[in-house]
Amino acid sequence: MCYRAHDPKWAFTSTSGAGAAIHGGRFNPKGVEVLYVALTLEGAFLEINQGFALKFAPCTMRSYDVDCDDLADLRTEGGRQVHSVDFNDMACAWFSLAAAGTVPPSWQVVRRLMGEGFAGVLVPSFAVGARRDWANLVLWHRSDRRPHQITVYDPKQQLPTDQRSWT
């Protein structure tokens, strides 16, 4: 089970990575669609608020069922060694580097792992205030079917199917 807090106007696209592709993120270069989900509820709130845990914009919380193969687990030093990833490359100041026209080391890691056939990564949370054991799942390849399955938990079909719910 994973979690994500969404802007309510995008409630109908719970597994899309289009928003992340607009500006890029720590683990996705600009133009690369990716879905970031937290492994804890607390982590999901912290991620959407970028460390401002006591003040946040309206959001809708989702839980997801995940059954995904081809993940690189980078949460531990041992896992990072298996995949030849340096923690400092993941923890880089990706936004500042990208804004200065430099390719962040975290994007280089992503491109290499994608080229090796990975669908995503399990990574520590880098949000300000995150506990050391909080982590995220970052999926470049996802579907509503195996082997890269992620589905939003919505047993009563309450989520809208388009943006007309907000007009």
Language-model segments: which ranges?
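Short His-Asn-centered micro-motif
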Residues: V37-L39, V123-P124
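A short, exposed loop/beta-hairpin motif centered on an aromatic-Gly-Thr core
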Residues: P29-A38
